[in-house]
């Protein structure tokens, strides 16, 4: 279960609980559901697991040491539901395109991942490997995102003065990791990256995602992996809403 971020804090407050109490309850419901569906899992992953936190911090440090994380100031339209910033061009009549709600404008100092450094490489990789993102309509959508010139470097932190519920940055203890950067890493942290037996056996893997999270999986994730020197996933298989 993906357990960090602004919306978890807000939901916990509404329920009169701490974030940890809230996610423990929700995660427990998911774990209780699987046997009822006749499904047995090998390992249930939570992004609040100590092992996951340690691997996220190791990955962040690797990207930082590679010179791909810098400190800067950013102002943008932030949707709590999506837990991401939107550019003016991405908004629809000033509203979040997913939730149709007005995002908050937030101006603050944060850490950024040099995603733009890897966008030309990513576009080339997608063109050279036509089935990397499938079906074709979503491959074309990702290429359009990259080649539009609208993508900026990725803000990968939140100041503790605004949000304490997250994984602390090793290189600045006044900040926590942005939830998407943290959550995407469970694909490899669950396998014991960088040296676990399961990681060696099962990665690179296949991804199956819904169309609303195409950008994090089709743009954020492969550039993160490239920066850290981790092999890319085999394919990104995208479906509409079920």
Question: Could you tell me what each predicted segment is?
Answer:
Residues 51-55, 106-242:
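Structured secondary-structure scaffolds
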Residues 1-132, 151:
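N-terminal, positively charged nucleic-acid-binding surface of large information/translation enzymes
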């Amino acid at each position: 279960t993906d357990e960090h971020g602004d919306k978890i804090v807000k939901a916990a407050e509404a329920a009169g609980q701490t974030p940890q109490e809230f996610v423990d309850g929700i995660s427990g419901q998911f774990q209780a559901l699987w046997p009822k569906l006749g499904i047995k899992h090998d390992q249930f992953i939570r992004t609040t697991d100590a092992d996951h936190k340690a691997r996220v911090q190791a990955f962040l440090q690797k990207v930082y040491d590679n010179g791909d994380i810098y400190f800067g100031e950013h102002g943008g339209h932030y949707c709590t539901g999506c837990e991401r910033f939107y550019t003016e061009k991405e908004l629809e009549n000033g509203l979040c395109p997913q939730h149709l709600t007005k995002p908050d404008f937030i101006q603050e100092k944060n850490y950024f991942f040099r995603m733009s450094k890897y966008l030309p490489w990513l576009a080339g990789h997608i063109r050279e490997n036509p089935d990397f993102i499938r079906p074709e309509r979503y491959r074309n959508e990702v290429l359009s995102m990259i080649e539009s010139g609208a993508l900026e470097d990725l803000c990968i932190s939140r100041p503790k003065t605004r949000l304490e519920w997250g994984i602390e940055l090793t290189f600045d203890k006044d900040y926590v990791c942005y939830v998407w950067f943290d959550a995407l890493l469970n694909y490899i942290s669950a396998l014991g990256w960088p040296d676990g037996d399961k990681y060696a056996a099962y990665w690179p893997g296949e991804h199956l995602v819904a169309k609303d999270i195409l950008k994090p999986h089709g743009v954020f994730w492969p550039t993160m992996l490239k920066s850290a020197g981790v092999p890319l996933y085999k394919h990104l298989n995208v479906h509409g809403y079920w």
